[in-house]
């Protein structure tokens, strides 16, 4: 194909998402495996679909950590991180530390509040 890999990856995610309910979970996992790794441009979307496929298979022990990894990614949309944090928690993976780090004031915040 003459399209850049990024567009082909996006097309794959959209196809898997559209066909998710009728696709065997293991096939979803296999198709998205190269994209469902932290640091990959499509990790958020591919990781969420992969984790949901694991939930569908009853493998919550594999889904929870993926949701937790998504929740830790500051470069992903807040809605996806929040949803992933909730899913991880529901699956027994503690993400409170992840949220606490995000809400902790930085050194500049502490300095700014002293002047008020």
Residue positions per predicted region:
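Soluble extracytoplasmic domains of inner/organellar membrane proteins
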Residues: 1-106, 114-116
């Amino acid at each position: 194909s003459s399209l850049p890999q990024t567009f082909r990856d996006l097309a794959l995610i959209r196809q898997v998402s559209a066909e998710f309910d009728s696709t065997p979970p293991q096939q979803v996992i296999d198709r998205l495996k190269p994209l469902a790794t932290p640091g990959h441009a499509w990790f958020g979307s591919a990781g969420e679909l992969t984790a949901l496929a694991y939930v569908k298979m009853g493998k919550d022990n594999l889904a929870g950590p993926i949701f937790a990894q998504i929740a830790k990614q500051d470069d992903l949309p807040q809605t996806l991180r929040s949803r992933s944090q909730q899913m991880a928690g529901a699956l027994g993976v503690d993400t409170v530390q992840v949220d606490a780090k995000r809400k902790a004031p930085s050194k500049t915040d502490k300095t700014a509040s002293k002047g008020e």
